[in-house]
């Protein structure tokens, strides 16, 4: 009788972990207009034009969950693939070979930081589009990013505040969450979650949070 699901975002059109199968993912939030082809052989992304089919499907799935009494945590960004997939980074829409906008990073970790204003502006535009798509629905929560490492802390704090500030002007306001920052060498700390402006958090098991959590102080929801 579960009443909560995570609606995953997968950021790369093509990826592979180790010797595993090659995986493909679509649609994506941005239109593939070209000119020219991206590294996966399909038209390059225009990061200033949204793929309306992506957002229509997002809303349809949240509405379908609502009819079944299910709350949906919309994952805005996904950090695991860029960290760990042996193939993946080179196919990301923000890799300079895959878009027509001259957007790119000097290091992939930059995508989850505040270091590149052009990337941040496009990320914020995407977040606003998600909010506009589902704001009137009651069964919505937001998760900023799944399993980005500790390099993402200030970026996640910024995004939490950004979502809250925009929704404050909208008809409805929804809980915004921050989940544990996982990384092979760059994991975050539960302390960073508790210090965040998030409404809800998902800590790692340290301190008994897997099976014997301590009393909550009421500042944040710890599901």
Q: Where is each model-derived feature located?
A:
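Short, acidic/turn-prone active-site loops that include or flank metal/cofactor-
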Residues: 205-208
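Active-site mouth of glycoside hydrolases
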Residues: 1-199, 210, 215-219
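Active-site core of glycosidic bond-cleaving carbohydrate-active enzymes
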Residues: 221-223
């Amino acid at each position: 009788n579960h009443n909560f699901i995570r609606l995953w975002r997968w950021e790369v059109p093509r990826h592979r972990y180790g010797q595993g199968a090659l995986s493909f993912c679509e649609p994506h939030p941005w239109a593939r207009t070209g000119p020219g082809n991206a590294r996966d052989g399909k038209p390059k992304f225009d990061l200033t034009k949204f793929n309306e089919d992506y957002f229509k499907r997002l809303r349809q799935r949240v509405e379908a969950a609502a009819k079944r009494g299910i709350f949906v945590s919309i994952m805005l960004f996904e950090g695991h693939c860029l960290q760990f997939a042996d193939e993946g980074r080179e196919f990301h829409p923000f890799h300079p070979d895959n878009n027509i906008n001259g957007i790119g990073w000097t290091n992939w970790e930059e995508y989850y930081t505040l270091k590149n204003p052009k990337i941040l502006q496009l990320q914020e535009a995407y977040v606003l589009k998600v909010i506009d798509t589902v704001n009137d629905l009651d069964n919505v929560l937001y998760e900023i990013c799944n399993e980005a490492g500790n390099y993402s802390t200030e970026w996640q704090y910024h995004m939490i505040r950004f979502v809250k500030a925009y929704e404050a002007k909208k008809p409805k306001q929804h809980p915004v969450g921050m989940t544990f920052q996982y990384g092979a060498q760059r994991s975050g700390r539960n302390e960073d979650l508790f210090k965040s402006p998030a409404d809800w958090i998902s800590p790692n098991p340290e301190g008994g949070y897997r099976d014997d959590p301590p009393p909550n102080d009421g500042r944040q929801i710890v599901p």
